[in-house]
Swiss-Prot record:
It comes from Buchnera aphidicola subsp. Schizaphis graminum (strain Sg). This is Elongation factor P--(R)-beta-lysine ligase. NCBIfam families: genX, PRK09350.1. Belongs to the class-II aminoacyl-tRNA synthetase family. EpmA subfamily. The gene is epmA. PANTHER family: ELONGATION FACTOR P--(R)-BETA-LYSINE LIGASE (PTHR42918:SF6), LYSYL-TRNA SYNTHETASE (PTHR42918).
């Protein structure tokens, strides 16, 4: 008899997972940061070209209610920022998130996210807060920090803030990656891909590493640095070559955020991807007034995987995608 009915992780490891999550909740309780719950189903998708949301629909036998498309959240970010705009104060959430076309050693279409927003907090201060969190909850060593520009110079001898297409083509050729050049004129996409393939696997080998000041073209929902408009107030966290989290000093400019969403959808068209419905509730919340804050989204399954010295996230999940 096949044993796929059994959990992906051992009961012993699931008990350890439960303890870590309890410790996380205790950490935030002591800091007087409110835990919140927000919808899993959203009336809008996300425009980020790197995210593929699941879509479903609502319908009723009542003729007055028409069939309605709904999206499973890729993160609770938009709803949590609506709470921030409504005056919630600093908040966190542990919840399920969903991303299509993502399955493997470090990916599962359904996964657990820790999302945390801290009011009146700079990017630098947020990095310190997260570093302390890792040390306190998981006994990690104090993290290192390096800028996106510095890490490119260290590994590839390329300045990502001033590089050219020809220089990047040579770099792709050097690493036998020319077959991955599918948008030849998209400088930013080439930079992102080479970072993922030739830099990320070597990051944070001994202890966590924060890479900060991502190029402004990769700002997503982060603000732009006031001293250097070429870079954003965005950072990512890596440990043992694995991305653990993505954080921002949050963008609070309604007009800039709307412009970025529109630009995302244009890029989706260029990549033959479906456009996504822009979340007007979220934009209205920013227009009302998103307070100055920083936030981070941490993949909890990956974090627990590293803490328990496992090789893949299915070893710390009760039932992975293949056993769901």
């Amino acid at each position: 008899m096949k044993k796929k009915w059994k959990p992906s992780a051992s009961i012993k490891d699931l008990m350890k997972r439960s303890k870590i999550i309890a410790d996380i909740r205790s950490f935030f309780l002591k800091k007087n940061i409110m835990e919140v719950e927000t919808p899993i189903l959203s009336q809008s998708g996300v425009t980020d070209v790197n995210l593929m949301p699941f879509i479903t629909n609502y319908f009723s036998f009542n003729d007055n209610i028409k069939k309605k498309n709904l999206w499973l959240i890729t993160s609770p970010e938009y709803h949590m920022k609506r709470l921030l705009s409504a005056g919630s104060g600093s908040i966190y959430q542990i919840c399920r998130s969903f991303r299509n076309q993502e399955f493997g050693q470090y990916h599962n279409p359904e996964f657990t996210m820790l999302e945390w927003y801290q009011l009146s907090c700079s990017m630098e201060k947020m990095i310190e807060e997260i570093d302390f969190f890792f040390q306190k909850i998981l006994n990690f060593n104090k993290a290192d920090k390096i800028s996106y520009q510095e890490v490119f110079m260290k590994f590839l001898k390329i300045d990502p803030l001033s590089t050219s297409l020809s220089e990047l083509f040579q770099c792709y050729k050097k690493f036998n990656l020319k077959n991955l050049i599918y948008l030849e004129n998209d400088l930013n996409q080439l930079i992102e891909n080479i970072f993922t393939l030739q830099i990320q696997p070597f990051l944070g080998k001994e202890k966590p590493l924060f890479v900060y000041h991502f190029p402004s073209e990769q700002a997503c929902l982060a603000s732009i640095n006031k001293k250097d408009s070429r870079v954003s107030e965005r950072f990512e966290i890596f440990f043992k070559g694995i991305e653990l989290g993505n954080g921002f000093h949050e963008l609070t400019d309604y007009f800039e955020q709307r412009k970025r969403f529109i630009k995302d959808n244009r890029k989706r068209c260029d990549m033959n991807l479906p456009e996504q419905k822009i979340d007007d509730y979220f934009l209205d919340a920013i227009h009302h007034g998103l307070p100055t804050c920083s936030g981070v989204a941490i993949g909890l399954d990956r974090l627990i995987m590293i803490a328990l010295n496992k090789n893949s996230i299915d070893q710390v999940m009760s039932f992975s995608f293949e056993r769901s």
